[in-house]
């Protein structure tokens, strides 16, 4: 019996039983209105309108097609004052009303100051008031129209100049002739040429003769002083601007005012003749001229490159480049000599105290042997010093046996004729091989060929 039943029919019966149970469990009460109907108790959360919920199709936020256009309500006449009521004219006006009427009827009298202001701002001549009183309203139209900013009237008076500046500018041109008469002819010619030439040609004049314009602040008086130096009269001079006091030689009238506020700064060579003719001790000062200080063209002379200082282990480049066979070297004698002390000149020691490094005279055995005679480019500490102010010349040679030989080339001496013998007596172990390269030295440069052995005491002890 159970096997013959159809499973589909059994499932349908189960679904029906469940639906019936659900209907029985539902509470008995007022049914909710359908979504299409309006309920004033509901409020939509989307649009905020009453009568429907947010899930209703009547909400315009979900369905714009169902949005209702607000209908215009009927015209309400009487609320708007389309025809305003005109005030009735009083039959017996009071004294106050009479005065007001007379003031309105009378044209407004404009004083001359208002007419001038109207003519200034608007740029139009003031119109004449009409007899019906309309001119009073039209004349005040310039107050309503936006106009440009008020012009700022500046006084035509010139600012006061400094009395000291005015006095100097007045006396500058008057006393220029007397100053030119008192100057030297060379300076007078340079002043006349600098004033007649253009700005470009004026810059090529002499550095010491050209008076450069300087200017003055209102407070202090910075003066520009050009001082030629004593140390370099032949090559070039270095001019340094300094803040100095007024000079006694040149008066204030010799200070021409600067036409250009900021002239270009140029650097030109300084001729030595001009500095000697004017005197090395003369100072040129240029006084105040205008408000802002002008940059005076400082005539920077040609500065020769300084010779680099050599350390104790540095080799000069000239010696490396010109290190040939038999090339002598100029060496300054040391301030104190070890072998010949009394013959040392104190003047030479004060002028150029030479810093001569020590040289390894005995080379190590690992080095390859050099040629028989070769000029050594390193300076050597000579044991003897030479009298006089002339430098010593020392020639270094490399021998075959690995030793170094040096020849001292000195100028003629007047009070020490026994010096060659003394040198030969002190160095008896000088090899004869080193005498041959001395012939290669030109006789015009060398006076004596004093050969001094430069081998150390260790090498002497090894030979013995």
From Swiss-Prot:
Protein's name according to its UniProt entry: Protein FAM90A12
Note: Primate-specific FAM90A gene family, thought to have arisen during multiple duplication and rearrangement events.
Record-linked Pfam families: zf-CCHC_6
Sequence segments annotated as region (Disordered): 1-42, 70-389, 411-437
Bias-annotated ranges (Basic and acidic residues): 74-89, 97-114
Biased composition (Low complexity): 180-197
Annotated family: Belongs to the FAM90 family.
